[in-house]
Amino acid sequence: MSRKFHFLQMKLNGKGANMLRKKMLRTFWLYKVQFISMILMVMLGIGMFTCFNIEWKSIEYNMFSLFKNSNYADYRLINSNGFSEEDLNNILDIKGVKNASRFITINADVNEKSGDTVAISITTNFDVSSFVLIDGEKYNKNSDDGIWLSDQYAKKNKISIGDSLSFTYNNIKIKGRVRGLIKAGEQMICVSDKTQIMPDFKSHGFAYISPSLYEGTLGFPYYPNINVLSNIDAKTFSKEADKALGNTNLIIPKEDTLSYSQAEGEVSEGKAMGSILPALFLLIALLTMISTMHRLTVKEKSQIGTLKALGFHDSKIVLHYTSLAFIISSLGSILGIALGYFLAWIIMNPKGMMGTYLDLPEWKLVSPWYCYPLIIIIIFTLTFIGYLSVRNMLKGTASEALSPYIPKKVKPMLIEKTKIFKLIPFGTRWNLRDIVRHKTRTAMSLVGIIGCTIITIASFGIKETMNDFLDVYYENGLNYSSKIYLSENASDDERFDIIKRYNGDYGASTNVKLKEKNVNLDIYNLENGKIQTIDKNSKKFKIKNHGAYICMRISEKFNLHEGDTFSISPYGGNEKFDMVVNGIFRSTSENIIISDKYAQKLNIPYKIDSVYTDVKKDDIALSNIIKSVHSKKMIMDSFEVFLSIMNNMLYLYVAGALVLGIIVLYNLGTMSYVERYREMATLKVVGFRDKKIGKILYNQNLLISIIGIIIGIPLGILTLSSMLKSLASEYEMKMSIGIPSYLFTIILTLSMSLFVSGMIARKNRKIDMVEALKYQE
């Protein structure tokens, strides 16, 4: 008998399991809109979060991979007089130095391409500061004509392996043949000088030639750099190097080089962007998902009671509904990861946004270690929320579970007790009562609108801040047509002859030590106003002759303010010069600015190395005095590319925020429509037309949207401020949000909310008044 009962129980259990599977499919179909919207919410939240975290991690991974494969130097010793073979051996004798090489990079004009320049590098040891071969012959240090050219420059200018090329530097012609196409860590961000933001391989590239070709053309070995591979800390290495060479030399750690610092800046920027805005996407999606899951189980209360009455054990009912939450969160997470990788690939590929900035041989997508554990935690959390929601509905007997869900009684609002309340239109009163009764739904709608507003205003704010910075610093700050670079061998008379001939302002740049920090000291004579400097309030000022001007980063790092005194030490000597801080300015690099008269007053030695003139580049002839000429147009063209990349990133954020906002509000609106179905049917019975009911719904969403915008805009400004602080190590920008940004944010957010309201209001036409009013009886 017991065996028959056991067999019958097994049979019933099998049928029960099959019934639950069918019910799950019916539930998915019945609530398909809610389930699809929840999946999309999780997908968007995780997709945006993973995308921007993959971006910075991939930059970091591929950057270090190139640095390792091209033997990127840890330190660079610089001496304008050059280093001998004996100097190199003295550095190699330092304990902890792995390898070293004499090195030089020169900017030369390409004779076959008028106006083009190429940074030519020569290393005496290929195991230090070399390159990665993409195509062609291996490097040969004894080659008399070998040129290993940037593959990007070759592609943009249709240059092939085997083609002849010639360059001119300081009136010296270097001839050779392209033996290979390469990428190099030293030129990962290939720009002609520090004023250019974005690479332009159409007009500027890089190449390596052999020491044999270089020394044979020049006639003697001149190497102003020794590049070093070492794990010694910067302070110790500096002391040991000075001791080995017998004097103080300029030593630049890799962290201060252009390629390394700019790439690190991109990583830091990516971390900041990936930890603030995408986190908001994730938070909005999760909060709304939790609310929706709870309300779905409330809607299923009678179904839960029916299953309980049929004899299904609580554990099976719990497993059934918890499985729904698990499937939704898992499917949304899988799709989110796929979306994240897809968006990251759009950004991180040779033809993508970052491909125009970084010159990398490998574009592997890498995710930070914490992304997948976090996604697992999210799936577990959402599943657990589903479990708690259904567990709450199972309390009590089957008959109690079968009874319809009754919202808790809400106390009358204070305003309801006043005479004013009776004067308020019926629709407004109805909306106020509904908002108070359904606080959670209202709160989630507010979260969606606030989040959308924060992301939108922050994105537009970044765009406007960057545009203003570039406009003030470059468009209006650089008032010259061409920048002339003078030869190191030119005499003072020859330099002043060029200044007079082209009626230009002039400057000199040298590296100095401020405490243990290497910074640029820029000395200017700007009588013609060819360069304008801006203070920390983004206002132009003239450089005076009785003090120094320091950038904001130096001011903050060394706690220096106007009137303070500080000391600098030029490399190659033991002198110290005391300076008074005359002002603080915004800059794209860590530098100090003084006038030529103040430099002469302090007896600071310098050589004029650049002239700023209104004469066009094509009208300036190269000579043994003028080594190269750059036009302002080259710099401004690079900004267009930079702004295009930045704008695409920000548009992606705004589009994602609007899509997420629409999904969140539509999901909550649909659930709200289901909850208020009977109330709206009652309104139809007493004579309200569909248009009038729709207007009531519009007004409620409009009220919530306005409140969300009012709260979201200040929070968005705080978010933008936080992001700018995290980017302060790379840019010294003043936050700028104009009226257009506010208007666009308000219009987009309201349009999104009203669009969703319209979609929900259209459902009023399908209300069955008889069925709705007798449903709970």
Residue ranges and their predicted role:
Residues 1-37, 299-303, 309, 313-316, ...:
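Feature of multi-pass inner-membrane transport and sensor proteins
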Residues 3-286, 295, 354, 469, ...:
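Membrane transport/envelope proteins' first extracytoplasmic loop
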Residues 21-25, 36, 256-259, 315-319, ...:
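Alpha-helical membrane-protein architecture signal
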Residues 31, 287-327, 663-703:
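Interfacial "coupling" helices/loops that link adjacent transmembrane helices in transporter permeases
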Residues 76-77, 426-557, 561-564, 568-570, ...:
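Juxtamembrane segments of multi-pass membrane proteins
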Residues 136, 162, 311, 336, ...:
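Conserved G/P- and acidic residue-centered "switch" motifs that form tight phosphate/ATP-binding loops
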Residues 246, 290-295, 300-302, 326-359, ...:
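Small-residue-rich transmembrane alpha-helices
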Residues 608-611, 622-744, 750, 756-759, ...:
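C-terminal transmembrane helical bundles of large multi-pass transporters
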